[in-house]
């Protein structure tokens, strides 16, 4: 397996730490006036999703994680697993609830998602940046009710709750940014 030195650390790099794949979020190289240089790294453990900060001596080396990102289409959820398919080879992969996590509320059938595989098992699922979902439940917007600019909560077809403008009604389709969970616009 290939190794990587702390001198080569950069955001997005995936390496093994304590036999668990980790991804670097931020890396800062520090050279104090006295003593040895070091890297202050903010990283995310890919299996547990936990974020932590660590410092590594300059020149330390680590094994690169054998992690692969693949684009797959979301098919369905059978209650236990979420099923995805490669649209070229038609190979199907099942991801458990732990791998999907909070992203389940943004999964729409036939949307292309990014799955991170480690040892051919899905460890994280990333939905597309934007999804279009139907509003299934929201309060009616009252005419003249413009006192607050915060909008109103709306429940979407996947169960996600998003703040929308007052003019959005039940049955309308809205575009939502899955990274922030914010309303982007109304789909015509």
Curated annotation (Swiss-Prot):
CDD domains referenced in this protein's UniProt entry, alphabetically: S1_EF-P_repeat_1 (cd04470), S1_EF-P_repeat_2 (cd05794)
SMART domains given in the database record: EFP, Elong-fact-P_C
Pathway membership: Protein biosynthesis; polypeptide chain elongation
Predominant place of localization: cytoplasm
GO molecular function terms listed in the Swiss-Prot or TrEMBL record: translation elongation factor activity
Sequence positions bearing N6-(3,6-diaminohexanoyl)-5-hydroxylysine: 34
Protein known as: Elongation factor P
One Pfam family cited in the UniProt record for this chain: EFP_N
CC terms in the record's Gene Ontology section: cytoplasm
Family recorded in the similarity comment: Belongs to the elongation factor P family.
Cell compartments where the protein resides: Cytoplasm
Keywords, ordered alphabetically: Cytoplasm, Elongation factor, Hydroxylation, Protein biosynthesis
Entry comment on modification after translation: May be beta-lysylated on the epsilon-amino group of Lys-34 by the combined action of EpmA and EpmB, and then hydroxylated on the C5 position of the same residue by EpmC (if this protein is present). Lysylation is critical for the stimulatory effect of EF-P on peptide-bond formation. The lysylation moiety may extend toward the peptidyltransferase center and stabilize the terminal 3-CCA end of the tRNA. Hydroxylation of the C5 position on Lys-34 may allow additional potential stabilizing hydrogen-bond interactions with the P-tRNA.
InterPro entries, per database record: Elong-fact-P_C, NA-bd_OB-fold, Rib_uL2_dom2, Transl_elong_fac_P/YeiP, Transl_elong_KOW-like, Transl_elong_P/YeiP_cen, Transl_elong_P/YeiP_CS, Transl_elongation_fac_P
Role played: Involved in peptide bond synthesis. Alleviates ribosome stalling that occurs when 3 or more consecutive Pro residues or the sequence PPG is present in a protein, possibly by augmenting the peptidyl transferase activity of the ribosome. Modification of Lys-34 is required for alleviation.
Gene Ontology biological process terms, A to Z: peptide biosynthetic process
